[in-house]
Amino acid sequence: GTIGFETYKMFKSYGAEVVLLDYNLKRLKDLQSKIKDLCIHCDVRNKKSVKKAFTQICEKYGGIDILISNAGTAINGAIGEVSDDILRQSFEDNFFSHQNCASEAIKIMKKQNINGCLLFNISKQSVNPGKNFGPYGLPKSALLSLCKQYAVDYGSYGIRSNGVNADRIRSGLMN
C-alpha cells in the first residue's frame, strides 16, 4: 500500500536492503515491475506463509535487522452492532498479522545476536478512538500493547520495539 511503499523508498534512500511482502498479488506484481528489490507474495495473517517468506529473506540476505510491520484494513461499524466475523477479521488483519511477523522476526534476530528493531504502524485509533471505528481501533489498541510487550520481553537482547502513528496520510485505507 501507500504507506508501505513510501517507507520502502525512505529506507532505500539510506542504503537499506528492503524486502516487500504483500498478500495482494496484483499490487505486488505492479511493484516488482517498478523496483529491483525482492517482493514476496505473503499472507501475513498466516504463520506458515510468514515463515516461508522470512526463510526466503534469510536465504537471500542472511537475516533480518529491522521489521516494519504495516499490515492493516480499516473496518468500521458501531462496536455493539458488528458481527463477530467482522471483528475477528479485523483482529486477524490488524493484530495477528503483526504478531505473526514479529514472532518470526524475533526468532531470527535472537539467533543473529546483533540487536534488531520491530516497528509497528499502530494508528491513532489505538489511543484516540473514533466513532464507528471500534472494529479497527480495538485490534490497533491491542497492537500498541503488543509493541510494548515486545520491548519488555526482548529489550535485554538489544531488540527494540516501537510504534508509529501514521496519521493524516491519504493512503486510501479509509475510503
Regions found by a protein language model. Give the residues of each.
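Conserved Rossmann-fold SDR core element
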Residues: G63, L144, Y154-R170
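Active-site loop of short-chain dehydrogenase/reductase
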Residues: G63-I64, M109-S123, S156-I159
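Active-site helix of classical SDR
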Residues: A102, P139, C147
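Alpha-helical segment proximal to the catalytic Tyr-Lys
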Residues: K107, V152-D153
